[in-house]
Amino acid sequence: MTMPLMKPRRKNPVLRTRQMNLPPFARGRTALGMTAAAAEGRFELQVCQRCRAVQYPPRDACHRCLSAKLKWTPQGGAGELLSETVLHHSNDPFYRERLPWRLGLVRMDAGPTVIVHLHGDVPSPLPFAERGHLRNAVDGSRTGPAAAVRVHVGARLDRAGAAVLIGFPPEESEHMADDKMLREMTSDPKFRKVLVTDGKTEVGQALVKALVKAGADIVWVGHAEPWKKLPGLDDITALPQVTLVPLDLTNGRSVTELAGEIGGKVDIVVNNAEVHRGFGIGSRRGTDAARAEMDINYFGLLRLAQEFGPALKGRSADGATHAAAWVNLLSVYALSNYPPHGTFSASKAAAYSLAQCLRAEMRPSGIRVINVFPGPIDDEWNQNLPPPKVTPAALASAIVKALKEGIEDVYPGDVAQEWVARWRDNPKVLERELAAGG
């Protein structure tokens, strides 16, 4: 069984900080289909549309009938562990620094045999000579059939952002998330120090509570106007892990000063600050509202990334609680403009594009950039929209889950799930539907 992770001791500041070495990440275009699914928390393999054979590894033609009609399809993941090996030596710097490392062969119920990283709670299979029989503990005689070692195969993104397969035990254990190998594939908040950029909103306060519940060591909570007493702030500041800090994303000096104070300690940045005004182009004269949205939603992210990004990248291999992730609260409106909230949609589309740049720049350091695309949030700016809407607590829960499972793109809520499905099916049709009112 996995032993619970103990809180690491404070690092000696005199010691050199390790630099990040990524695992091998070269993948062909076809194999990136598995990465695309894993980025959203799904395990998919190619299935031949002619003979229904499941393919592994990814390929351009079916291994059975040579058909090129292969479709990425979700898999259940059940299988039997055939063999395992423990890596005690590697010439690859990433694995060399993390030995020993378990690997295994799993014969999936769907057909193919796959190579997986093995979770520590998966028991070792019997030797081939012993397969199919149990032995008497006294004299070693065969007493009956031995149970196969069952595993559940799931897809995760490794530190380089490439999809890998992991063999999990069929049932979750108490400290399963503390497995050394699994923590290298995820951004679990446990014992990490987190910055939440805006604590005055219901979403921000729900995030703080969810992160504390997930085991965060310290949660710094940004407040642009610390002299104001806003509802809910007293509740979160009463938590021993929480510290309120001055942070105004419209003010470059404010961001720089806070980065100088805590930037070298932050392990996870959660940028939830946003301005949302329900206007289109013609519903309000002037550019003041649109400028305010862009100043926070786009330029705020830019200021934050320029100041906190370098330190985050520099600590991405700094022990068991290394810097791990950057979370951007975007909107499903970023995918296709929603005219009643047109300027807000435009600001989030700009932020989405910038977040893709941030992800590309963070990837060489192994920092995961998580983009969250919720549907309408149940707050004052969506008051007149009918349900379903995403509650702040549900949104916070989805973000913490993404951190724990190493997911890159999250679409919380029924509306977001529906919109992204329609967008993938035909972006132009969705544009026309939204222009016509939905």
Residue ranges and their predicted role:
Residues 256, 274-291, 314-321, 340:
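Conserved mid-core segment of classical short-chain dehydrogenase/reductases
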Residues 215-232:
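Conserved glycine-rich Rossmann-like NAD(P)H-binding loop of the short-chain dehydrogenase/reductase
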Residues 236-252:
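Rossmann-fold cofactor-recognition segment
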Residues 305-306, 356:
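A short, exposed helix-loop element centered on a Lys and neighboring polar residues
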Residues 318-350, 355-356, 360-363:
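Catalytic loop of short-chain dehydrogenase/reductase
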Residues 200-201:
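Conserved glycine-rich cofactor-binding loop
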Residues 371, 379, 383-424:
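C-terminal helical subdomain
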